[in-house]
Amino acid sequence: MSVSTLVFSVSIMFNWWRRATRKLMVFDYDETFSPVAMLKSIRILIAIATFHDYEIWQMDVKTTFLNGKLSEDVYMRQPEGFVQSEHPNRVCKLQKSIYGLKQASRRWNICFDEKIKEFGFLRSEDEPCVYVRTNGSIVVFLVLYVDDILLMGNDIPTLQSVKTWLGKCFSMKDMGDATYILGIKIYRYRSRRLIGLSQSTYIDKVLKKFNMQDSKKGFIPMQHGLALTKAQYPSSSSELEKMSGFLIPRL
């Protein structure tokens, strides 16, 4: 694909997305909720895979939300630069989901659920983004977090077949062995069946966001008699809430 073709394609996608975010005067989306895998579920499955010395592979879905099929009629104005001169007042009827739709995430989740079940996976009743497939002694776990996929199993040919199936259904990127997921760095020592999870990169990102990257590490509980200045305190309640919000979901 040439650079000019790529720029043209990106321009089309941007215009459609911008139109979609302003698509309706009357909002009627039906259900828009879409589940994602819980972080504790990911940690538990990684621990199980490490204990049994399973493979832990990672894949990424490209243009995720463009895969969903719409169950309702959605219309939008023609995007700027691509208006039909003979019918400038006509609107477009979407055939599939696009970025910007309220229901895009849910439609993608439903689409993925249907496709992966066709390949013999069963969905967990308690964790809707965790799937399992078994065949005798062969077991494969699949974890979905929006567009991130973790594959864990004890049979490489079976795992390869899952990759092939996903590649037929969606545009995929093979990430190989899982080393980084949801801001968590994975350190694996297979010979000892040990694994380490580190969020140092995420911590550095949060510190940089609040201009604290040069801060020195401290210890809790704080030293007796430590005096704090107002300059060290969040400048507003809003900033305090933001700082807390980055920490609480990760505990």
Locate each region found by the language model.
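Long, low-complexity, charge-biased intrinsically disordered regions
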Residues: 1-251
